[in-house]
Amino acid sequence: WASWVIEGSTEKIFFSGDSGYGKHFKDIGESFNGFDIAFIENGQYNEKWADIHMMPNETIQAAIDLKAKVFVPIHWGMFDLSLHKWYEPIESSYSIAQEKGIPIIAPKLGEILTNEVQNKSDLWWRASIEKEENTLKVSAVVE
């Protein structure tokens, strides 16, 4: 698919399209000598779709290969194309990023990011998970 780089006088930003994992991330990271922030696809994955969508561990490896100072997971929690729950990509990637010491920002839908933000650990999506699970419990009791 397609990815692009925005290179300003003081910052470099990487934005990925849908992609399978490969050495191209390391090549790009080396070519641009790393990125201040990398927006990397993180969702709608399945082992059968390895050429077009990365698994969470591959997304984190791509952030490492790109030499990203900060990683922003994108393409998650949207359209249900895969078999995983809507929140699985962010939960998995957040956990792996924390284990590997990769700064991760997961902005709320519509939230504006500024270049001062380095590591935002607001786990806002968990309230939605809890609400969804409680709704399912209530529905099961009512039926």
Feature locations, PLM:
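Core dinuclear metal-dependent hydrolase active-site scaffold
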Residues: 1-33, 109-143
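Cap/insert and terminal regions of metallo-dependent hydrolase folds
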Residues: 12, 20-109
